[in-house]
Amino acid sequence: MNRTKLVLGAVILGSTLLAGCSSNAKIDQLSSDVQTLNAKVDQLSNDVNAIRSDVQAAKDDAARANQRLDNQVRTYKK
């Protein structure tokens, strides 16, 4: 039990020391990286939404073409 408390105390102390050693420049750089990644995610999301509408338009065109072909086949069978 005492060993567990000692290890836990060492982990907490180490975390505190590491947190105190981080510099504002590094935090600013990481914040900038996060903002850049968020912008890229937003752009990719917009691209996916644009592609979805293009895919739906292609599906609609294919359905209309298939319907026309079905109608032509019916007229030949008559």
From Swiss-Prot:
Instruction: Record the organism.
Output: Pectobacterium atrosepticum (strain SCRI 1043 / ATCC BAA-672) (Erwinia carotovora subsp. atroseptica)
Protein name (database record) = Major outer membrane lipoprotein Lpp
- Which topology term describes how it sits in the membrane? Lipid-anchor; Peptidoglycan-anchor
**Region forming the signal peptide:** 1-20
Name a single GO cellular component: extracellular region
Using the UniProt record, give the first listed, main subcellular location.
Answer: membrane
Mark the sequence repeats by their residue spans: 24-34, 38-48
Q: Which UniProt keywords apply?
A: Cell outer membrane, Cell wall, Coiled coil, Lipoprotein, Membrane, Palmitate, Peptidoglycan-anchor, Repeat, Secreted, Signal
Q: Which domain of life is it from?
A: Bacteria
Subcellular location, record wording? Cell outer membrane; Secreted, Cell wall
Taking the record's annotation, the residue ranges forming a coiled coil are: 27-75
Similarity remark: Belongs to the Lpp family.
Q: Name one Pfam family in it.
A: LPP
Q: Which gene encodes it?
A: lpp
Q: How does it assemble?
A: Homotrimer.
